[in-house]
């Protein structure tokens, strides 16, 4: 049987899965996801820690996050790529929440942010002990 798709996503990591969800949400066509292993075996599932994003502009900002990322990468990282990733991270978090990711919250109902290696501010979001 021949199946027709408008989009083909290869791999089951967060980048491919996010793209597939965005295309599906936009109603742009049928999406096929092809992967050689189970979802649990993708590198994204093996990542440790959480997801870094500026979420509170009162105490954090993109400039600080970019600086932290460049330092952590020993200034070898492509500055333009780092800036793009950092500045798009908040929208990525909003998308993940829209798709059902339930990040940990504090008593006030705000994201329960953590500060982990290489970060000067509390900007790491988690879901229990599952994110990375």
PLM feature spans:
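Core beta-strand elements of the Rossmann-like FAD/NAD(P) dinucleotide-binding domain
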Residues: 2-5
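N-terminal Rossmann-like FAD-binding beta1-loop-alpha1 element of flavoenzymes
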Residues: 7-33
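Conserved N-terminal/central alpha/beta ligand/cofactor-binding core
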Residues: 30, 35-132
